[in-house]
């Protein structure tokens, strides 16, 4: 049964991945929204931190707007969330069936946009159901306690049991769908071409870091909602700090994004999550919400600089790794990423202009190809079971044949144009 649903999901992703490129504006919007959703862990929405800083209050109001369904009461948001979730599942089934039997294209186009934006709306959809599931475990059946988040529901009453069951189903569907989308539906194309502006921001060779971040965010969200009392502030602060630190370390180790800007922003996002945990601990220990709140936002540029320095340090370390130090498939690909980055930096010196093929450009490209081929050959020989390495190898040799074919054509053209001696 599990394999059947996995096959259907892969089929849906395959028909929707005809174009995985994403506008940089959309990438920036999505990154900003998900960052605000992480910052909201420090708001009063889950655990009371009682902000007194005006700047913090404004930011948290914006974070509230993008993290939960706005302009709706708690119970209305619950109904909207369940309806959207079930509607998306029904539309996905309709898309797959209409394409399979009638080759309809329009549903695929719409489904592609839903898959792109689903990671952004995951928090607003799942939070109402986690609130329904988790918030009554602190109370007994005999207490007849009003639900902490839904005033018209009594904990462990018959109505609560029905909503509880529905929320279990919807939350499970949302979590599994989000995990599959993050793990399978992403731009895995390696960068190519001399136009650096055309390189995708979101391209990456693996989704392991994104999947890890998703799992940690979901666990933190469950704990924040389940432990919504002030006594949890220290524990949740430490857990948030460790989660962000682990996410940043994993990003820097794997370096999954081909574009430095994307890697920098996601590393900054992970450090911000870690700093959110530190601020929660300081706010609780010092009992100073105004001063600590200002410190939280003052440190944001420092975190960005720290992310940039950490990324540059990691790039330098990877560049200095010898062949015997490449002890796993991930390090093999990070080494290849370093070679590609060196070549694209060489191209960057000419600016964002059209570059004619020249002997210098051909020499640099062939040098990069040679280094990548040698590294791939050694990697496949030492780590034959690494999936990401096999996927990249297939893409590399498919892409490599295109510039080499153009070079051969150009050389033959030059030979024909030369006078006979």
What do these predicted regions represent?
Residues 120, 142, 202, 255, ...:
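A general structural-boundary detector
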Residues 249-263:
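Alpha-helical transmembrane segments
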Residues 197-203, 207, 365, 394, ...:
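Solvent-exposed, well-ordered amphipathic alpha-helical segments
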Residues 113-120, 357-360, 395:
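Short interface patches used for recognition in eukaryotic signaling and trafficking proteins
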Residues 1-245, 260, 264-267, 271-306, ...:
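Extramembranous, membrane-proximal N-terminal regions and early juxtamembrane loops
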Residues 113, 195, 248, 359-360, ...:
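General secondary-structure edge motif
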Residues 298-384, 388, 392, 398-421:
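N-terminal alpha-helical interaction modules that lie
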């Amino acid at each position: 049964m599990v394999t059947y649903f996995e096959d259907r999901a892969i089929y849906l992703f395959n028909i929707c991945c005809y174009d995985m490129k994403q506008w940089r504006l959309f990438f920036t919007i999505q990154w900003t929204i998900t960052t605000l959703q992480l910052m909201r862990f420090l708001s009063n929405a889950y655990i009371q931190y009682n902000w007194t800083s005006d700047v913090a209050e404004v930011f948290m109001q914006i974070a509230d707007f993008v993290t939960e369904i706005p302009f709706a009461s708690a119970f209305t948001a619950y109904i909207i969330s369940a309806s959207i979730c079930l509607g998306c599942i029904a539309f996905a089934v309709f898309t797959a069936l209409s394409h399979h039997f009638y080759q309809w294209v329009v549903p695929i186009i719409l489904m592609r946009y839903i898959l792109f934006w689903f990671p952004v709306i995951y928090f607003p959809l799942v939070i109402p159901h986690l609130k329904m599931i988790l918030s009554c475990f602190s109370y007994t059946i005999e207490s007849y306690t009003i639900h902490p988040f839904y005033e018209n529901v009594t904990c462990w009453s018959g109505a609560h049991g029905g909503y509880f069951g529905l929320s279990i189903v919807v939350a499970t569907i949302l979590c599994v769908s989000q995990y599959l989308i993050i793990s399978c539906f992403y731009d895995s194309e390696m960068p190519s071409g001399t136009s650096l502006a055309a390189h995708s921001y979101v391209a990456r060779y693996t989704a392991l870091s994104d999947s890890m971040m998703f799992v940690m965010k979901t666990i933190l969200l469950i704990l924040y909602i389940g432990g919504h009392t002030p006594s949890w502030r220290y524990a949740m602060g430490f857990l948030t700090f460790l989660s962000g630190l682990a996410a940043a370390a994993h990003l820097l180790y794997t370096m999954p994004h081909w574009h430095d800007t994307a890697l920098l922003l996601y590393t900054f996002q992970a450090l911000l999550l870690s700093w959110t945990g530190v601020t929660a601990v300081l706010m609780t220990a010092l009992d100073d919400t105004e001063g600590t709140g200002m410190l939280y936002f003052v440190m944001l540029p420092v975190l960005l600089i720290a992310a940039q320095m950490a990324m540059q340090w990691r790039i330098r370390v990877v560049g200095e790794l010898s062949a015997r130090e490449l002890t796993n498939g991930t390090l093999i690909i990070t080494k290849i990423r370093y070679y590609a980055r060196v070549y694209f930096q060489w191209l960057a010196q000419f600016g964002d202009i059209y570059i004619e093929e020249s002997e210098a450009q051909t020499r640099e490209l062939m040098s990069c190809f040679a280094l990548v081929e040698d590294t791939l050959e050694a990697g496949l020989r030492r780590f034959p079971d690494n999936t990401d390495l096999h996927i990249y190898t297939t893409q590399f040799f498919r892409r490599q044949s295109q510039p080499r074919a153009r070079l051969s054509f150009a050389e033959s053209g030059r030979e024909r144009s030369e006078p006979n001696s």
